[in-house]
Design a protein with these regions (language model features):
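Short glycine/serine- and acidic-residue-enriched loop/turn motifs that recur at repeat junctions
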Residues: 1-16, 46-67, 101-127, 156-183
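Short glycine-/Asp-/Thr-/Trp-enriched loop segments that recur within the blades
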Residues: 19-24, 75-79
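Beta-rich catalytic cores
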Residues: 25, 32-33, 64, 80, ...
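Conserved core positions of repeat-based scaffolds
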Residues: 35-38, 47, 90-93, 102, ...
Length: 183
């Protein structure tokens, strides 16, 4: 039908290129509950959609955007994003040298646990590093948790664990993190 896509269709989004250089191509993309983010081939990170839960990386809980906007970075930021993964309450990015950064609300972004830097607040409106045991090669976010594959082959997860999704025991305390021991 007119409202569906098949394998030979493209998605036409009027205004999608607003603010983006016409030469930039999408390198990676992920969608969450009410927002989406993409990494462009220049390794910049852009998000759009509903801004609640700090999803757009704008430093506040109120912004929403129907067109892609760049995620806020500190002055002098030079590291490049190579992948992005969105959950329902948080988003995570993988940077070029294996750092994982997350932003959003609650423990899903890593708050209140040993994997989070001391500067991480309960609600983080901008990307904040997750303290992993080694550099990451992949990050994936679920409803209220995330996991990363590390260069040494192990997996570390953080966030909610009501159903044992962190692989550290069924219904452990919310916010408890642990190494899954997957090799």
């Amino acid at each position: 039908g007119a409202d569906t896509l098949d394998t030979h269709s493209s998605l036409n989004m009027p205004g999608f290129q607003s603010g983006l250089a016409s030469t930039n191509q999408t390198f990676d993309i992920s969608s969450g509950a009410d927002s989406a983010c993409m990494v462009l081939d220049d390794r910049s990170l852009w998000c759009w959609g509903y801004g609640a839960d700090y999803a757009l990386g704008q430093g506040n809980n109120e912004s929403s955007s129907s067109t892609p906007i760049p995620v806020l970075r500190p002055a002098g930021w030079a590291e490049q994003t190579i992948a992005v993964s969105l959950g329902s309450y948080h988003n995570c990015e993988l940077l070029a040298f294996g750092t994982v950064q997350c932003w959003g609300t609650q423990y899903a972004a890593g708050a209140d646990g040993p994997l989070v830097s001391a500067s991480f607040s309960y609600n983080s409106g901008t990307p904040t590093p997750v303290a992993l045991d080694a550099a990451a090669v992949l990050v994936d976010s679920g409803y209220d948790h995330s996991c990363a594959i590390l260069v040494n082959g192990s997996v570390q997860c953080w966030g909610g664990n009501l159903y044992g999704q962190l692989a550290v025991g069924y219904k452990c305390v919310t916010g408890t993190e642990g190494d899954c021991g997957v090799h």
